[in-house]
Amino acid sequence: MRHRRVFLTLLLAMLAVPDVAESQIEISSRASSIQVGGRAHAQYAASSVGDADNDFFLRRVRLIADITLNDFVTARVQPDFARGKIALQDVYVRLGSSSKFRVWVGQFKRAFDIFELSSSTDLSIIERDARVEGVSGCSGVSGICSYSRLIEKLKYAERDQGIKIDGSSGRLSYQATLTNGTGINVSDENDGKSYSGRVTFAASEKVSLSGQLGVHDYLIESAGNSTARGIAWGVDVEFGTWRDGAHIQASVIRGDNWKSLDSSNSEATFFTTQIVASYYTERRGQLAGIEPLLRLSLGDPDTAVGKNAGTVVTPGLMFYLQGKSKSGANLDIYSPQSGDTALSFKVQTYLYF
């Protein structure tokens, strides 16, 4: 009962936050113009696991500087100050005056997963990986066996440092990345590189279909730190768009779980799928909109082994204050094939400016 009062008090306090202007500040600096914006996400997370901590914390505190030198050269610098630490997120220079072909150099998201490529300012699932504090045991990646947990910890998705190309023509768009493979703000550990590619076809104004391929290089310590490569591939579909009625994102991915090797250093095969459906209804008055949502996720870290997969069901509700500024709650329900069901209740406020 005490936790319920905390949840309700926090949610009501979030809804009392005044509207926030979303126009970015534009300034001039030397030979460039700079637009400054940012986001601040404050979260409360409570787990059903007995020895887990229930925690208030700042999930994201990011300032974004979008820099324009001319029609050919743009850049972004995005530091994150969450939890009292400084970590660079997007930091890149982008070259190109045509939407058909552009080159990025720096740190950015790999060209792979639809949920990772979707901004946290748009997503209404509070945590992509549906983490439940106090739960572990997913083969190779620890934590829970969920869609984003697998592809993030196996480094097929998330940010990395390197080179990216992207573009679009008609109904087709593409992006490809060549990166270190070690992740955000980390130097390379070998001479190998990781590759990712993604192609999207806009079947209609509201429906898009995509296919993606990722090749990740890693070190095998038991083989003298020799370099090997894991491969993952998948397809996804998106119906609708953000904050406009029905919106659905669904994906299926299969590949090598290189963090789970057998005695001959062969990778296990993982399989994961996820669908997130939401419906945004515009409102008048204090609230700009209301959005209920539902996530279904399955993660199997080793398809050759029985009863080691897990499922996630996440009902949620978001209250929009203005634009992308919102507050809401998710209940992540994790059910492993072997073990007890665990819950994580999360409330988060999203400030976008």
What residue ranges belong to the model's regions?
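Outer membrane beta-barrel
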Residues: 25-184, 189-196, 200-209, 274-282, ...
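Sec/Tat signal peptide C-region and signal peptidase I cleavage site
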Residues: 17-23
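Bacterial N-terminal signal peptides that target proteins for export
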Residues: 1-8
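Intrinsically disordered, low-complexity peptide-like regions
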Residues: 1, 17, 127, 328-330
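Outer-membrane beta-barrel pore domains
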Residues: 48-51, 70, 94-96, 104-107, ...
